[in-house]
Amino acid sequence: MLRFATAVLVAASFAAPAAAQVQRAFPQNALRGAIVIGVAPDIQLNGRPARLAPGSRIRDTNNMAVVPSGLTGGRYLVNYTVDTYGLVKDVWILRPEEAAVRPWPTTPNEAQAWQFDPAGQVWIKP
């Protein structure tokens, strides 16, 4: 019985770190904004009308893919990318610790002027 209890404790010590959330790596072209999802593909991005691209991906706080209809009407702080046609392509709903990372560009002009550290997932203003 003692060996079994020891084995369970050892196994639990390895399983605990696996349950921790992994830091997500956002691409350099990801911008930050507030999104309100209406009837897909229509959304409000930073208070302005926008559209989701065909095949767009929305990731929740657990990095799981979600469909826009499950998020209708909610307001979320997100990082997002835009395709060449100006449509919103990828959306990541931010966890509180990700939202606390500042500064993060909200416009393409800011992203071009600042420097991005992909390893640390931080932006550096000049």
Regions found by a protein language model. Name each.
Residues 9-17:
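Hydrophobic core
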Residues 2-5, 17-44, 64-126:
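Short, flexible, surface-exposed loop segments at domain boundaries
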